[in-house]
Amino acid sequence: MNDRPPTPLLDTVSTPEDLRRLKPADLRQLADELRAEMISAVSVTGGHLGAGLGVVELTVALHYVFDTPRDVLIWDVGHQAYPHKILTGRRDRIRTLRQGGGLSGFTKRSESEYDPFGAAHSSTSISAALGFAVANKLANKEGRAIAVIGDGAMSAGMAYEAMNNAKQAGNRLIVILNDNDMSIAPPVGALSAYLAKIVSSRPFLSMRGFAKRVAQKLPRPIHDFAKRSEEYARGMATGGTLFEELGFYYVGPVDGHNLDHLLPILENVRDGDHGPILIHVVTNKGKGYAPAEAAADKYHGVQKFDVVSGVQAKAPPGPPSYTGVFADALVAEAKRDDRICAITAAMPSGTGLDKFGKAFPERSFDVGIAEQHAVTFAAGLAAQGYRPFCAIYSTFLQRAYDQVVHDVAIQNLPVRFAIDRAGLVGADGSTHAGSFDITYLATLPNMVVMAAADEAELVHMVHTAAVHDSGPIALRYPRGNGVGVALPAAPERLAIGKGRIVREGKTVALLSLGTRLGEALRAADQLDALGLSTTVADLRFAKPLDEAMIQTLLTSHEVAVTIEEGAIGGLGAHVLTLASDLGLIDGGLKLRTMRLPDAFQEHDKPEKQYAEAGLDAESIVATVLAALHRNSKGLEESA
């Protein structure tokens, strides 16, 4: 049963201003009700549950102590922001999370003044908060900037780049390190909480600053010894030496579920003159919901579920997922070839490489949230004769574009890019859409770019990439399940730059790349019914193009249409360039390009997103009819 829980105290809180009217003694009850409301809401919508459960008390404490939205609160990634949304005027829509027309699953500037900076990709919060803090400093405006970042996100270099530049913000910048994997600190107790309260206080920080100023006037050897001694002592007590070296005052570790600990420490930091400050808060992902606490992934991402049992709704049986097909195909290749390695950037299960890791742990590398390193690491392996597959979501490969260009393409190193989540991705929306990889990869010399039309094609492309040693190669495939075709008993090596004719006709040529092939075939049925004989080609390659086949199709049909799940500048642009180079456009060629719109599309079901983008069968038919000046019945329209 998923009945809504009683929340009498939470019902009185619509905004943080309401929250700040409560007594501190009421906050424990509020946190419990907030947690229950979040569990109830996500049970209806699905989404990211575990991270939000882990920061309920921290969210309450931050909005209680700080004057949001004047004090800006920036959540890294945003998976943990559901409690924040409930407390900031969006509770009435919380059961629309990740639904078409509903709330985003991440923070979003256009959604609320309490979301000062949008997020979805990792490790951006400190840089953004630093920008807000320095802007306030330059304008002599009141207001702190608080970044909440998880310990996993601290594996990305960008977080340290920001911290290395943060000193200029002074006490206007506060970083909350949400350690929910116990990867940095041991369990916290009363002593560490007491020490954290002491070291966050104004007298301690003032005395420490005074001692530093005195030490700087001592002879150099004595000054250096004093500095090392203080760091050693504080490092033993708190583990904060690294952050101190980056110019932060370190406070913690603190029990992130104990409001009696959190409130005075946050108040001390708020009222202090010293900074920037890093508060190390230890939390438990999935806190307060037994099924989540017992699960290996702490219910990080869930389907709709029953609140009482925690049992998640299962999707109806269907074809295997593209991710699963890729993983199985790569494992099969690795069994035949011990030069094959697999690299992921903190997404082993999301990319399917957890299967590879179990089969070949010595050839599997999870480098953390470090896409730039992942690509150059793969380049180094390739330079030594190995066959690395770098499996990264399309949206995250954007973070390593310079490495793709400088370290891979220019040196023509045979790195294999397995690009998951290509095209539109549904509930995760614009921040996770794989819209741009065709454009930014196909423009590079030496690069080969493939797109699988179905799961069988994906198996062939994994094999083709595995044995391709003459330069870098990428294969892209979408989120979700395949179309249900039989998988090949043995993979084939595809000829580089060669497409295939799936259906032959005479009047219309549809040139499809990737999984829009199914819609192209549906459109062909409709066009044939209107008396317009239609050829459908699966180009397979965005680069190099099958120039001979494309030239034949363009010159032997009345109209040709390219169809792709990518942004402007991709397949269509390359086909137009080819037609121009061959002089085909001089003779009145009717060529149309269908691609994603020049806009960031909001979250919705993928099929609705593609219909909105004009990439469904009906839109293809309409494009053809318009090019031929025919009406919806296929009849010629008078000029």
Swiss-Prot record:
<keyword id="KW-0414">Isoprene biosynthesis</keyword>
<keyword id="KW-0786">Thiamine pyrophosphate</keyword>
<dbReference type="Pfam" id="PF02779">
    <property type="entry name" value="Transket_pyr"/>
</dbReference>
<feature type="binding site">
    <location>
        <position position="289"/>
    </location>
    <ligand>
        <name>thiamine diphosphate</name>
    </ligand>
</feature>
<comment type="subunit">
    <text>Homodimer.</text>
</comment>
<feature type="binding site">
    <location>
        <position position="180"/>
    </location>
    <ligand>
        <name>Mg(2+)</name>
    </ligand>
</feature>
<feature type="binding site">
    <location>
        <position position="371"/>
    </location>
    <ligand>
        <name>thiamine diphosphate</name>
    </ligand>
</feature>
<dbReference type="InterPro" id="IPR029061">
    <property type="entry name" value="THDP-binding"/>
</dbReference>
<dbReference type="GO" id="GO:0030976">
    <property type="term" value="F:thiamine pyrophosphate binding"/>
</dbReference>
<protein>
    <recommendedName>
        <fullName>1-deoxy-D-xylulose-5-phosphate synthase</fullName>
        <ecNumber>2.2.1.7</ecNumber>
    </recommendedName>
</protein>
<dbReference type="GO" id="GO:0052865">
    <property type="term" value="P:1-deoxy-D-xylulose 5-phosphate biosynthetic process"/>
</dbReference>
<keyword id="KW-0808">Transferase</keyword>
<feature type="binding site">
    <location>
        <position position="79"/>
    </location>
    <ligand>
        <name>thiamine diphosphate</name>
    </ligand>
</feature>
<comment type="similarity">
    <text>Belongs to the transketolase family. DXPS subfamily.</text>
</comment>
<dbReference type="InterPro" id="IPR049557">
    <property type="entry name" value="Transketolase_CS"/>
</dbReference>
<comment type="function">
    <text>Catalyzes the acyloin condensation reaction between C atoms 2 and 3 of pyruvate and glyceraldehyde 3-phosphate to yield 1-deoxy-D-xylulose-5-phosphate (DXP).</text>
</comment>
<dbReference type="Pfam" id="PF13292">
    <property type="entry name" value="DXP_synthase_N"/>
</dbReference>
<feature type="binding site">
    <location>
        <position position="180"/>
    </location>
    <ligand>
        <name>thiamine diphosphate</name>
    </ligand>
</feature>
<dbReference type="InterPro" id="IPR009014">
    <property type="entry name" value="Transketo_C/PFOR_II"/>
</dbReference>
<keyword id="KW-0479">Metal-binding</keyword>
<dbReference type="GO" id="GO:0019682">
    <property type="term" value="P:glyceraldehyde-3-phosphate metabolic process"/>
</dbReference>
<dbReference type="InterPro" id="IPR005475">
    <property type="entry name" value="Transketolase-like_Pyr-bd"/>
</dbReference>
<dbReference type="GO" id="GO:0008661">
    <property type="term" value="F:1-deoxy-D-xylulose-5-phosphate synthase activity"/>
</dbReference>
<keyword id="KW-0784">Thiamine biosynthesis</keyword>
<dbReference type="GO" id="GO:0016114">
    <property type="term" value="P:terpenoid biosynthetic process"/>
</dbReference>
<dbReference type="GO" id="GO:0009228">
    <property type="term" value="P:thiamine biosynthetic process"/>
</dbReference>
<feature type="binding site">
    <location>
        <begin position="152"/>
        <end position="153"/>
    </location>
    <ligand>
        <name>thiamine diphosphate</name>
    </ligand>
</feature>
<dbReference type="GO" id="GO:0000287">
    <property type="term" value="F:magnesium ion binding"/>
</dbReference>
<feature type="binding site">
    <location>
        <begin position="120"/>
        <end position="122"/>
    </location>
    <ligand>
        <name>thiamine diphosphate</name>
    </ligand>
</feature>
<feature type="binding site">
    <location>
        <position position="151"/>
    </location>
    <ligand>
        <name>Mg(2+)</name>
    </ligand>
</feature>
<dbReference type="Pfam" id="PF02780">
    <property type="entry name" value="Transketolase_C"/>
</dbReference>
<dbReference type="InterPro" id="IPR005477">
    <property type="entry name" value="Dxylulose-5-P_synthase"/>
</dbReference>
<dbReference type="InterPro" id="IPR033248">
    <property type="entry name" value="Transketolase_C"/>
</dbReference>
<comment type="pathway">
    <text>Metabolic intermediate biosynthesis; 1-deoxy-D-xylulose 5-phosphate biosynthesis; 1-deoxy-D-xylulose 5-phosphate from D-glyceraldehyde 3-phosphate and pyruvate: step 1/1.</text>
</comment>
<keyword id="KW-0460">Magnesium</keyword>
